Amino acid sequence: MTQMIYPTTNLKATEQLVIERGEGVYVYDNRGQQYLEGMSGLWCTSLGYGNEEVVEAAAQQMRTLSYSHLFGGKTHPAAMKLADTLADMVPVNNARVFLGNSGSDANDTLVKLLRYHFNAVGRPEKFKIIARERAYHGVTVAAASLTGLVPNHT
C-alpha cells in the first residue's frame, strides 16, 4: 500500500487493486488479470484506453500548449474551439459553455450559478436544490451534499 488516501474507499473492507494498463475497453492489474472497464475510468475514457487518435491529439496539444487556465478572461485556441463545438451541439440560441475539470466541478459551478441567478433577480430566498437519492453527483463539498449516497458525505 502507498501513502495515498483513496476517495470513498474503506480499505479494511476492500482489497487494494492496482491497475497497471488499459487497452480498448479492458484494464489489467499488476497480476495480469483482465477486467472489462464498464465505467469508462469514471467517465473519462469513453473512447477507450490507448485510442491512438486520442493519444496523438493529446500529444500534439501537449507540444503546443500543455496547460493554460481560463481565469481572468484568458483563453486559448483549443478551449475556444471546444466551447464553440459544444455550443453548436445544443438547441439553445446564444449558448454559453463552462469548461471545468470534472463533473463535481460542474455541479459545484451550477450551484453557484443558481445562487447568483436568484440573487440577481431579487429572489435570494430561493436556495434549495432538489437532487435524487442514491444518485452520484460528485465528491467535492457541494456535489457530495447533493449526492444521495451517505458514504460520500464524510
Predicted regions and their residues:
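N-terminal glycine-rich, Lys/His-bearing helix-loop that initiates the first secondary-structure elements
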Residues: 1-95
